[in-house]
Amino acid sequence: MMPDMIKDPFARLGLDREVLTVSQLNGRARVLLEDVFSSIWVEGEISNLSRPASGHVYFTLKDSGAQVRCALFRQSAARVRQALKDGLQVKVRGKVSLFEGRGDYQLILDTVEPAGDGALRLAFDALKAKLSDEGLFSAERKVALPLHPQRIGIISSPTGAVIRDIISVFRRRAPRVELTLIPTAVQGREAINQIVRALKLADSRGFDALILARGGGSLEDLWCFNEEAVARAIDACVTPIVSAVGHETDVSISDFVADVRAPTPSAAAELLAPDSSDLHRRVDNLHRRLVSRMQDRLMRERLRLEGISRRLRHPGERLRQQSQRLDDLDMRLRRALEQTMHQRQLRLAHMQSRLAAQHPGRTLAFLRQRLDALAERLPRAIREQIKARKLQLQSQVQTLNVVSPLATLGRGYSILLDERGHAIRNAAQTQTGQRLTARLGEGELHVRVEDNHLTPVTLSLLD
C-alpha cells in the first residue's frame, strides 16, 4: 500500500486520473489545505480591514513580499481584546482554507494577538527569569516518570476535547490503568486557586503520576498556567507531573516547572501509557526465562535418570521405557514451547502491524512528495506570470503611444489654450485681441487673436 501511494500521490485524494469539475477541484483542494495546515501561526501587518454587519471581520495580512486574505468569524472576533486596525502588526492563528466560489485560499482565524512584547509577554518573561534564578527549572528538581504507572490523576476541565483525548489514548494503549479526574477551571482568575487546590489534593492521593492539561488558546486564555502560585504548587508536589498545556507551539511557566513537558494532552497520555516496545522487551525476557528453566529441568531429569540407571544392575526394559517416556516428554515440551512462542510471535506481529498502521511516516512521505512537486512548479509559474505581464505592459505602452496627444503634436499639430489653460475647440470661444498660448510638439508660442470669425482664426505672434 505504501509504495503505491508514493508512486501516485493523487491516489490519496481519490483523483485516479478522473476529470473533475471546477467545484470538485476546489472542494478537494480545500480539504487538502485544511488537513495539512490545520493550525498555524502567521505574523504580518493588517490592511484592508472590513467589518460588515454580520459581525465577521475580514482583512489582508501582509509583509514586504506577500499577502493573504484572512477571515475572523463573529464568534472568534468577540474573543479578540485588541482593537484591530489597518497597519497593526499582529500574530494570528488559524487554518488554511479555500473559498470555493472564487478559488482563493485564505486563513480562517481563531486567535489574533498583537505582535511584539505586550504586557503579558513582559510579565511572562519576568516571572520566568525569577523562578529560573531560584532554581525551580533545574534538572535536579525533576522526578522521573514511572515505567508502568497504575494510578494516574488528571487535573483538567471535566468538559471538552482534552479529557476525551486523554481517556481515548489510555483505552487504546493501557486500558487497565486507573484514571482519576480532579476537575478544575482552566481559564480565568478563579482558575488559579482551583488549580492550586487540585494539585495539593492530587499530590495527597498517592497517584503514580499526574497530568496537568488544557487545550490551546491565546496567551491570555492560558495565563493561569503562567501564575506564580500555580508554578510553586507544581514545584511543591512530590508526585511526578506532566504539563500538557495548549498546543505544541504554546509554552507556559508550568511547562518549565513540571517534571516533564508534553506538547499536547494526547502526547502526555502516551508518555505514561506502556508502549509496544516495552511489551516486546517483556515478552523477550519471559521467553528467555522460560527456555532457561525448561533447559534446566531437562538437564536435571537427564542427570537423575543417569544416576538411577547407574544404580540398577539390570536396567533393561525399564530404562528403555523411561528413555522413551523422557523423549516423549521432551517432544511434548518442545511442541508446547513452540506453540507458546508461535502464539506470542503472532500476537507481537499483530501489535507491530497495528503500530505501523498508525505511524505518521506514510502521511509525511506523501506530504513531502506533494511539497516537492509544488516547489518545482512554483518557479515556472512565476516566470510565466512575469512574462505574460511584460507582454501585456508592452502592448499597453504601444496603445498609449498611438493615442497620445503628444504624438499628434509631434506630427505638426498644435493645441490652443486660453489664459486658464482650457483648450480652444471653436472660434466662438475667442475674442479679438485675446491672448492665447499655442502648445507645439516642442515648446509653445504666445499669440493674439486678430479675427474670430468662424472662418479660420487669424493670429499674430506677440512681441
Curated annotation (Swiss-Prot):
It catalyses: Exonucleolytic cleavage in either 5'- to 3'- or 3'- to 5'-direction to yield nucleoside 5'-phosphates. Its main location: cytoplasm. It is found in: Cytoplasm. CDD domains: ExoVII_LU_OBF (cd04489). Keywords: Cytoplasm, Exonuclease, Hydrolase, Nuclease. GO terms for cellular component: cytoplasm; exodeoxyribonuclease VII complex. Signal peptide: none annotated. GO terms for molecular function: exodeoxyribonuclease VII activity; nucleic acid binding. GO terms for biological process: DNA catabolic process. Its EC number is 3.1.11.6. It is an enzyme of class 3 (hydrolase). Gene3D superfamilies: 2.40.50.1010. InterPro entries: Exonuc_VII_L, Exonuc_VII_lsu_C, OB-fold_nuc-bd_dom. NCBIfam families: xseA (TIGR00237). Bidirectionally degrades single-stranded DNA into large acid-insoluble oligonucleotides, which are then degraded further into small acid-soluble oligonucleotides. Belongs to the XseA family. This is Exodeoxyribonuclease 7 large subunit. It comes from Pseudomonas syringae pv. syringae (strain B728a). The lineage of its organism: Bacteria, Pseudomonadati, Pseudomonadota, Gammaproteobacteria, Pseudomonadales.
